Structures are given as C-alpha cells and as structure tokens.
Amino acid sequence: MSETKNIDEIAGRLSKDIFKHFLWTTHPKTDDNFECANEKHVGEGGKPKATHPGDVVFYYRDPYLGKTVYLHTDLKSYAKDTITSTRLRGAFKSLCMAIDCARCSDSWRAKYSVDDGEAHEVRGLLFVHNHDNGYDKPFYEAVDKVNLQALPVAPGTQLHYLGPHDIQRLYSIANDILRLKGEGELPSTYTFYYPDLVMTRRQGDVWDQSATIETLTAPYIIIKHRATEEQSAGYVIYYNAPASSPEEFEYFLDSLSRFQML
C-alpha cells in the first residue's frame, strides 16, 4: 500500500473517531463514485465528468429543520506546505459539482440508502486534515483567498468545511467525552442541547440529538445528560470563543440563564 493511501486513510479513521461522539451516523459505503448527471460539469482539461467522488457520507437529524442532513464528505489529508488557496479552490470546485448532482441523483440516493419520501438535505463537507501537524496558520485566511463567488455553487446548495485547527479541537472534545464516560462522569447516553429559538422551535425528542455541523463550529457546545446512580442530571459545556473580554462572558452567562441552565 502506498504512503499516499496510508495518509488518506488517516483522515478517514480520524473523521469516524471524531464524529461518532457527536452522534453522527456513518454510511457503510465509503470511497465510492457516483454517476455525473450534468453535462456542464467538466474536470481537468475541460473534459466532461463521468463520475463524482464520495469518500464518506455522514448523516444526522437536525432538530431545528426536522429533517435528516446528509453530509457528502471530501476527506483531504495535506502536509503543512500544501494547504494553499489554489489547492482548496480545486477541492471546493469538485465538491460543488458533486453536491449539485447528488441533490437530484437517483443513483446517489440508492447508493446511500436515502428514501425518496424522507425529508432530507444533501450538503457538502470539506474535511482538511494536516497529517504532519505543522500547519500553524489560520485556515480561514487560506479559505478567504479562494474566490468563492467564482465557484460553481448551485442555488440552494450548502457547503461546510473543517480545517486543521477545527479537527484538532473536535478530536480533543471527542477524547474528553470518551474519558468522562470511562470515568463515570458522563452517562453512555447523552444528547446535545438545543433551546427553542425566537423564530425556530426544536422538533422531535429532546434525547439522542446529534451535534449539527453548525453546532460544531459554534461558540459553545452543550451536552445534556440524565442522572445516574453516581451522577446527578446536568450539562457539559465546551467553550469555543476567544475569551478575550468580560463582555463576552457576560453574554455567555446571560445565554445560559435564558436557557434556564443556571
């Protein structure tokens, strides 16, 4: 097996190790292509694309939308010097075309076991792992240099991305969840907390809610758990904001009070 293949597999294993703790489901079919149905989609050299790649599909129920979100994911594993705007532009362009086809493709739905009658959305996720752990720049600066307006994003399409620092942070949280469960401080069953919003109410059972992709990049992640023989019911909160001013914490505490958590 080549070194490149080994590096690519690291990203696959890492993504599964992370997202299972956020209660995402991984479709068993991985590293598979599906048929391109748009003659306007062209690859390198201007040749029409025959297929689109699919590294892995994650999915979860969105409690605000009341539907299942499928994340057609492109797993990238780059060395620190190869995380460039040019390379990211190519990855985003490929993912844009893949999602454009996936959203209306019968073969994609059949491949990933999506019922035609199921309320769902298909989105793209670009997962960029730095395998030599040397990338110390803000990933968002590289993304900002990509001319997103020039990408072939179809109307209604949503793309998400996680960079090296996002992945390190989420891996750390996943390991902490694993540790808390192992030490009996967090029950094996838990849920991610979603308050009713002013314009949007949460739908479905409050328990076994997954962390949405928006939650994973939000200022904080809240886990809610029931009481056990050793532990009272409560919350675990992971904070993901700069923590640079007193006003920031005042707003955070006001939010917790508004959620009736204090």
Predicted regions mapped to residue ranges:
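Intrinsically disordered, low-complexity Ser/Thr/Pro/Gly-rich regulatory segments
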Residues: M1-G54, F58-L262
